[in-house]
Amino acid sequence: MSNRTLLNLKFVLCISTLMSSLAFAANAANDNVLNVYNWDDYEAPDTVSNFEKQTNIRVVTDHFYTIEALETKLLAGKSGYDLVFPGSDFVSHQINTGIFLKLDKSKIPNYKNLDPVKMKFLSKLDPDNQYAIPYQQGTTGIGYNVKKIKEIFGNDYVVDSWDFIFKEENISRLEQCGVAVLDSPVEVFATTLNYLGLNPNSSESVDYERAAKLLTKIRPYIRYFRTSQYSDLASGDVCVAFGWSSEVLMGIERAQKANKGLEINYVVPKEGAVLWYDMMAIPADAKHVDNAYKYMNYILEPAVMADISNYNLYSNAVLPALDLADKSVASNPNITIPDDKLKLMFVVEPQDEKLNEVINSLWEKIKSSKK
């Protein structure tokens, strides 16, 4: 091959590469596509397909299985996603980092369907609800094996209070069948503080030391600390789980499918509990922002949100959706929290770095003090 031929070939290749790059960039900016990062199996079976039919926008969804995976991608930047589903606590911690786009609510007409009471509740984490919209709502409460509890405490015993776990005379009797506790220091401490009559979002380290004293007292009776608990509850390996409603409800579903006569129940204790939301947010560097707004607006349609809640067994913040949801969701006070009980619920608010170090240090000491 001659030098001139080689130069001509290089020139053609350079032009071809440049044109391909420009075409790729144009497609990235203008493609009728929406890149989503969400928990696995977190929408109704036809949620995405119906949106695609209505809008002719192709939805490309990647799934994460741990909140750490989502956080790592978002904090690294240039994730490539247009819409993500972080927890409300993560949103509150990261608003000031600039990783989320400030919402243009004029592009979300169905925003009007959101419950103003719940939005005010969430404004504690996202002032004026500027960066995120609630998707699904959950709580942190108690899941338990009905048969095992009756065997231990008698048929008339009612699980309706945090006394069930925090009183040593109760949890000591549960050790034989297994108690699992959520491995989330902020939620467990907030719950313990509230149980002790203290501010669940206290900024005083002495309050956390008091809570740690109670947790250390009951620590010998706790089998393990783990975020995912539903499989052990469903299999009967543990009889009590202090954890997320989502995990316990998954356990209930798994137990029913196994058809082994295992009855699991979930309760939000009368003293109140942590209320949390998974949110919809747009990364600041999203390429298809208008498509993200269209999907947000679609999700806030009452019928769409009702179908999602029916499938997930979660409540939501879309008021008209509750009228359309199945009774198993809308009328279950442990899923759709009634207004009188909502007053007792609390969100976990962000703390400063120094206090977080105290909380994490106390937590590690509690977990390591088995006996």
Predicted regions and their residues:
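Mature extracytoplasmic/periplasmic domains
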Residues: 278, 283-344
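Periplasmic-binding protein-like
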Residues: 208-216, 260-281
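Conserved C-terminal helix/tail region of periplasmic/extracytoplasmic solute-binding proteins
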Residues: 339-371
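Extracytoplasmic ligand-binding site segments that recognize negatively charged/polar headgroups
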Residues: 91, 95-223, 230, 234
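Paired acidic/hydrophobic, glycine-rich loop segments that form the ligand-binding mouth/hinge
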Residues: 81-86, 223, 239-244
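A ligand-binding cleft/hinge motif common to bilobed small-molecule-binding domains
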Residues: 90-93, 240-261
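Bacterial N-terminal signal peptides
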Residues: 10-23
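Early extracytoplasmic/lumenal segment of secretory-pathway proteins
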Residues: 26-97
